[in-house]
């Protein structure tokens, strides 16, 4: 490669020759690195209300932020803080997870209060479930009066016996059937030859 005439030093494209600075072995140049976490930001007065990231009253303008967040609830922040840089969401009640709802959103309490009443609960109609009268008990049978749903319904005895004879159900077992003997009433039933066990009612 031939150099142009008049050029004594072969330095290309604006390169400057390196200056050799003599460095002694005892003197080394030490530079302290800049820790960004130690730098202070503009301060908490930048925004109207301090953030709740990391811990309560955390300075959001600091460069270093903690790795966790305490969810402190500021109910007045969403109403008063109109200059906050964070997003503010106003949810439309008609939007559901399936899209825009076409029907009006009515609370369930209003649905229940507007339900039509059954015909037997209207005024002037007879009540189906009537309370059974209290029966006097002997001192040996004294117990607290327990009213069940079966006792509150007054069924005619004829209808109950007709159902038991039609279904082949035997009357309530006596003490002899509980002890292992078959009652005479059960032998008269057409279902007496079945292998069903006798249950006490």
UniProtKB/Swiss-Prot annotation:
Polar residues composition-biased segments: 191-201
Gene Ontology, cellular component aspect: cytoskeleton
Region (Disordered) location: 172-201
Residue ranges of STPGR repeats: 171-186
Family in the record: Belongs to the CIMAP family.
Protein name: Protein CIMAP1C
Organism: Bos taurus
Gene: CIMAP1C
């Amino acid at each position: 490669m031939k150099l142009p005439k008049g050029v004594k030093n072969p330095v290309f494209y604006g390169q400057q020759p390196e200056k050799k600075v003599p460095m002694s072995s005892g003197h080394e140049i030490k530079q302290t690195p800049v820790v960004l976490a130690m730098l202070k930001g503009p301060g908490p007065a930048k925004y109207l209300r301090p953030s709740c990231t990391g811990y309560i009253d955390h300075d959001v303008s600091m460069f270093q932020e903690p790795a966790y967040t305490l969810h402190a609830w500021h109910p007045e922040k969403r109403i008063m803080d109109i200059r906050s840089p964070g997003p503010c969401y106003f949810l439309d009640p008609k939007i559901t997870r399936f899209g825009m709802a076409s029907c009006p959103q009515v609370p369930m309490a209003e649905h229940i209060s507007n339900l039509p009443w059954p015909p037997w609960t209207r005024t002037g109609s007879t009540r189906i479930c009537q309370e059974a009268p209290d029966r006097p008990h002997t001192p040996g049978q004294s117990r607290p009066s327990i009213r069940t749903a079966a006792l509150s319904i007054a069924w005619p005895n004829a209808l109950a016996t007709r159902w038991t004879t039609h279904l082949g159900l035997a009357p309530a077992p006596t003490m002899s059937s509980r002890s292992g003997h078959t009652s005479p009433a059960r032998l008269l039933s057409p279902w007496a030859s079945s292998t069903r066990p006798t249950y006490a009612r």
